């Protein structure tokens, strides 16, 4: 079994895609690519790691498809479930063969609908899309590994949009308001404003303005169309009365939440005026307000985008789905869905019990010592493999509607990637993304710890003109859809706890909104001021000629400046060094160096990475505490998914700074505090050594503070001490 204990049982195609080890783990140079307890990250290819001096078995960097750590009890349950499913699959083979033969002989017109349903379920690994009917008897289609039933599978034909039932249409209860942002941006944009802005976008001409508001910095980019007098920021919004909402939403929200809190007032002007936004100050305390604003905006857009079928207007897209929400876990999906339900107050909820059975986990599984952000992200169902279509009618919400019949699609990046298929397949299905007009990415910082390539893949396939008609009435399609300009009208909203180069690049390359885009970033006082103990913190800057040269320059500095210090320690002073390494690729490089280089042959070490299972991690922690291992190599993603409370730490070496500033506080402060309390370290004698380059400016700002970062990046000196 691969590290993590689940690689042999979580593969297959029953969730709508290939084996998890095959697509999720490629990651990036940042070592990303999986979710907690479920996800897989493929390790870099190369020779198998051979550590002759390390007693415990280590993971192989050439091993692919390994799962993230899980406890022994859940591993045992997976094994038992797998064996039972295999027996059921074998006994059902005659029946499956019969159903397969019946489907293969079915008329071609019927197969088209079944093909889509099967493709949505099976994804790229499916070789027999006709096999979807097998699932009607409760068996898993194409699942030879005995995997559990796909709770997100939908077997439903595409609806003909020209024959919509009366109950599927929304009430026309609002008078036309030409100042409504929906009308200004989508329905009836002014040609004299729109055309020069589109031309500026095509020429990559943007005008940037920096606006300071309290402790928040707003970087606003608008297409440089020569309209210098245009106001970059819309008018402030303090409550529901300032919004142009559908009447039913206005009446529902006014009694419950008439006034907005500070977070809501910050994001509402950009959000409801259809401008792209990267909000980099998401907190646990402000998460409820963010979900409220995002849900209200999504509902308002869906209700307004559903045109009157009796009018001969160009008011539609190619396909029905208008809103896409990318979320990290099933529990995060539950929170967003529940917020939507509380706002629109439907009379009926179709398939609600199925939703609760598949998405809600009420068991408490974390101890009190876990931090709030960890419990907020991983409480409930932390499965990062899901997709859910939601359809709205006048009085009903339908869960698990087929994508082409849905108004809003909720999905994790992996779940949606599986539904689309892989590039190796002859038939990819992403037409349902052709008319997405609003993308909401919540908890983007958590998605960075999964496989960010899936997010990039999804954005590359947004607003691409569809290959099939899907019953579209082209006489009703908006002209800018036909002109292949939908991406310039789509609004993208990203909420993250902090900013990273990946998020900035996503905003730069995939956000081309003609209304402009903004990045909201909080000024930071620095987490070094909030450490629970007094420790000497030394920040050492090394020079790197380019971003591509940074990994080699970092490794060279580590081996020349840090390793000799570790090798000099003797006796009891040699124990207790924790080396924190954010990137898994850097971790492999350092691990191999410690295992094979003569310079550190007298330095015993252990490792804890995101691939280490629970017994392996426990063994490494124990050996580190009792001094058998002098050095412990520890990755950022291992800390993200597990938040281990490591004891015996006397000194911390940051091979690179973490993206999440809370990790610095927990590792550099929390671990040393435990050592002081257990009398392993005298008060104030803990040591923290940090390596950084000029390309770590975003991370460094969150650690040392906005006021210090410029000096540390540009000063002639390369060593900075904090006490």
Swiss-Prot record:
Primary subcellular site in the record, as a coarse category: nucleus
Basic residues composition-biased segments: 27-37
Family: Belongs to the UTP25 family.
Functional summary from the UniProt entry: DEAD-box RNA helicase-like protein required for pre-18S rRNA processing, specifically at sites A0, A1, and A2.
PANTHER family (alphabetical): ORF PROTEIN-RELATED (PTHR12933), U3 SMALL NUCLEOLAR RNA-ASSOCIATED PROTEIN 25 HOMOLOG (PTHR12933:SF0)
Subcellular location field: Nucleus, Nucleolus
Keywords: Nucleus, Ribonucleoprotein, Ribosome biogenesis, rRNA processing
Source organism, top-level taxon: Eukaryota
GO molecular function, one term: rRNA binding
Region named Disordered: 1-175
UniProt KW Oxidoreductase keyword: no
Entries under InterPro entries matching the protein: P-loop_NTPase, UTP25, UTP25_C, UTP25_NTPase-like
Annotated SUPFAM superfamilies: P-loop containing nucleoside triphosphate hydrolases (SSF52540)
Comp. bias regions, Gly residues: 1-26
Subunit structure: Component of the ribosomal small subunit (SSU) processome composed of at least 40 protein subunits and snoRNA U3.
Example of a GO cellular component annotation carried by this entry: nucleolus
Name assigned to this protein: U3 small nucleolar RNA-associated protein 25
């Amino acid at each position: 079994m691969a590290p993590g204990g689940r690689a042999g049982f979580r593969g297959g195609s029953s969730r709508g895609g290939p084996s998890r080890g095959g697509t999720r783990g490629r990651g990036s140079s940042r070592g990303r690519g999986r979710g907690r307890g479920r996800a897989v990250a493929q390790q870099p290819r190369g020779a198998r790691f051979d550590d002759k001096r390390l007693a415990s078995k280590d993971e192989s960097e050439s091993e692919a498809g390994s799962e993230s750590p899980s406890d022994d009890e859940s591993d045992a349950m997976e094994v038992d479930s797998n064996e039972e499913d295999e027996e059921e699959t074998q006994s059902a083979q005659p029946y499956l063969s019969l159903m397969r033969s019946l489907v293969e002989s079915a008329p071609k017109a019927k197969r088209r609908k079944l093909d889509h349903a099967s493709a949505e379920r099976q994804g790229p690994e499916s070789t027999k899309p006709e096999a979807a009917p097998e699932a009607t008897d409760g068996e898993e289609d194409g699942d030879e590994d005995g995997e559990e039933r796909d709770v997100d599978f939908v077997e439903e034909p595409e609806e003909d949009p020209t024959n919509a039932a009366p109950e599927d249409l929304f009430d026309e209860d609002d008078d036309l308001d030409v100042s409504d942002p929906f009308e200004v941006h989508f329905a009836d944009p002014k040609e004299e404003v729109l055309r020069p802005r589109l031309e500026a976008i095509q020429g990559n001409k943007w005008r940037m303005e920096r606006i300071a508001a309290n402790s928040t910095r707003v970087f606003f980019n608008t297409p440089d169309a020569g309209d210098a007098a245009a106001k970059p920021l819309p008018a402030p919004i303090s409550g529901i009365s300032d919004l142009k909402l559908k009447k039913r939403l206005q009446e529902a929200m006014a009694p419950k939440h008439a006034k907005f809190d500070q977070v809501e007032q910050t994001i509402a002007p950009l959000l409801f005026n259809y401008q792209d936004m990267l909000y980099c100050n998401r907190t646990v305390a402000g998460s409820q307000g963010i979900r409220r604003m995002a849900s209200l905006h999504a509902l308002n857009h869906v209700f307004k985008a559903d045109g009157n079928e009796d009018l001969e207007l160009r008011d539609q897209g190619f396909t029905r789905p208008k809103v896409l929400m990318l979320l990290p876990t099933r529990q995060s999906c539950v929170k967003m869905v529940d917020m939507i339900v509380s706002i629109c107050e439907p009379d009926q909820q179709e398939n609600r019990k199925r939703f609760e059975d598949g998405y809600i986990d009420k068991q408490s599984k974390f101890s009190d010592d876990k931090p709030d952000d960890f419990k907020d992200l991983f409480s409930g169902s932390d499965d990062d493999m899901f997709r859910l279509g939601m359809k709205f009618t006048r009085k009903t919400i339908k869960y698990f509607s087929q994508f082409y019949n849905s108004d809003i699609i909720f999905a994790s990046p992996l779940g949606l990637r599986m539904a689309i298929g892989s590039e190796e397949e002859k038939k990819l299905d992403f037409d349902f993304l052709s008319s997405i007009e609003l993308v909401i990415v919540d908890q983007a910082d958590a998605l960075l710890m999964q496989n960010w390539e899936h997010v990039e893949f999804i954005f590359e396939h947004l607003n691409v003109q569809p290959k099939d008609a899907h019953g579209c009435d082209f006489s009703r399609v908006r002209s800018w859809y036909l002109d292949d300009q939908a991406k310039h009208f789509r609004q993208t909203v990203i909420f993250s706890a902090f900013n990273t180069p990946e998020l900035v690049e996503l905003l730069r390359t995939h956000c081309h909104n003609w209304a402009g885009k903004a990045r909201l970033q909080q000024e930071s006082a620095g987490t070094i001021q909030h450490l629970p103990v007094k420790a000497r913190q030394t920040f050492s800057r090394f020079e790197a000629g380019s971003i591509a040269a940074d990994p080699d320059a970092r490794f060279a500095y580590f081996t020349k400046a840090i390793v000799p210090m570790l090798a000099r320690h003797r006796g009891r002073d040699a124990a207790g060094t924790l080396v924190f390494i954010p990137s898994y690729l850097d971790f492999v490089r350092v691990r191999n160096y410690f295992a094979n280089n003569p310079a550190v042959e007298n330095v015993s070490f252990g490792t804890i990475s995101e691939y280490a299972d629970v017994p392996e991690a426990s063994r490494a922690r124990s050996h580190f505490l009792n001094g058998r291992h002098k050095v412990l190599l520890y990755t950022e993603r291992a800390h993200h998914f597990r938040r281990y409370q490591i004891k015996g730490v006397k000194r911390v070496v940051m091979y690179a700074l973490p993206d999440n500033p809370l990790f610095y506080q927990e590792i550099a402060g929390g671990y040393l505090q435990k050592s002081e309390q257990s009398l392993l370290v005298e008060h104030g004698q803990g040591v923290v050594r940090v390596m950084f380059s000029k390309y770590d400016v975003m991370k460094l700002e969150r650690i040392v503070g906005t006021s210090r970062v410029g000096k540390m990046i540009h000063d002639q000196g390369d060593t900075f001490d904090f006490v």
